[in-house]
Structures are given as structure tokens and as C-alpha cells.
């Protein structure tokens, strides 16, 4: 798709994060399998569920925009995943590996925070006010759905930082 307008750029950004979220959802179970810290594993398990919900929200955003949910290859996401897998695969010590897993997970979170923040800013600038029925919650604008995902990503980043600072990095050192 040729990007000729800001709206085209917005759609491309949605497709980019859609692809990235789906790739990250495939990567989280691998990280869980290689992690040894129980709190880290449980945190990834909970975030995998959040990631699946974020993908569902993106499906709803696409539908509200009259688009078929689809991704475009996101080289940044693939690069983060490849680098993480290579790094984690080179580490035998479980504590050091956990520290690398946290750092890799935070690289993913920071990418997602960037993408969702950008998409929200673009949607606001474009005046995108489309709504999605959320059942008992009522209707939410697509900006609200993107904000929910952004808030979850920021929360996951805070949790990873706290776990790294309080336990994982100390054990690795």
C-alpha cells in the first residue's frame, strides 16, 4: 500500500503493531520456557493474556475503520525477537539468562509503547472518533482501545523494571 496521506500512515501503523503483537504473542511462550524465575514466568503468562486481548482490540479497531485486520511485516519487531533469541540462546547460567530475558522483554515493551503512543497521537490529530461496542462497558472510541493497550504495556514495563531491580539483576550479579 502506497502511503500518500496521514490516514494511510495511521493504517500502516496499525498494521505494523498488529503484526508485531502477533509475533510477540508467539515469542512470549518461548521466553516463559527459558525463564527460571517463577515471578518472571508468571508475569509473562499474565502478559500473554493481555497481548491476546490487545490483538482482539486491534481487530476491533480495524473493523471500526471498515478494514480487514491484517499486519505488514515489521522488521523492527523481527529484529528485536531475533536479537533476543540469539542473546538468550548464548547464556547457560539461569540467573544471567533471566536478566537477559527481562532486558529483551523490555525492548519489546518499549517498542510497543512507542507504537501505541504514536497511533494515539495520529488518531487524535486525524479526529478518528469511531466507536466499538464493548458490551456491558458500552461504546469506546478506537483511541480509548489503543490507550488501554498503551497503559498495559507501560504497566508491564514497570513490573519488569521492579522485578529486575529487586531480584533478577541482583541474582545475576
Predicted region positions:
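Amphipathic alpha-helical hairpins
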Residues: 1-173
Amino acid at each position: 500500500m502506497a502511503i500518500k496521506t496521514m490516514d494511510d500512515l495511521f493504517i500502516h501503523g496499525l498494521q505494523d503493531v498488529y503484526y508485531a503483537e502477533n509475533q510477540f504473542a508467539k515469542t512470549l511462550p518461548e521466553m516463559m520456557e527459558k525463564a527460571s524465575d517463577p515471578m518472571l514466568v508468571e508475569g509473562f503468562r499474565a502478559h500473554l493474556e493481555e497481548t491476546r486481548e490487545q490483538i482482539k482490540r486491534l481487530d476491533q479497531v480495524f473493523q471500526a475503520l471498515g478494514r480487514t485486520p491484517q499486519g505488514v511485516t515489521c522488521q523492527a519487531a523481527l529484529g528485536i525477537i531475533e536479537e533476543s533469541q540469539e542473546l538468550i540462546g548464548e547464556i547457560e547460567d539461569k540467573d544471567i539468562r533471566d536478566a537477559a530475558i527481562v532486558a529483551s522483554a523490555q525492548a519489546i515493551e518499549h517498542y510497543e509503547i512507542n507504537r501505541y503512543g504514536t497511533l494515539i497521537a495520529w488518531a487524535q490529530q486525524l479526529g478518528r472518533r469511531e466507536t466499538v461496542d464493548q458490551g456491558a462497558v458500552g461504546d469506546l472510541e478506537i483511541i480509548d482501545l489503543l490507550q488501554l493497550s498503551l497503559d498495559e504495556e507501560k504497566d508491564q514495563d514497570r513490573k519488569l523494571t521492579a522485578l529486575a531491580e529487586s531480584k533478577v539483576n541482583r541474582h545475576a550479579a
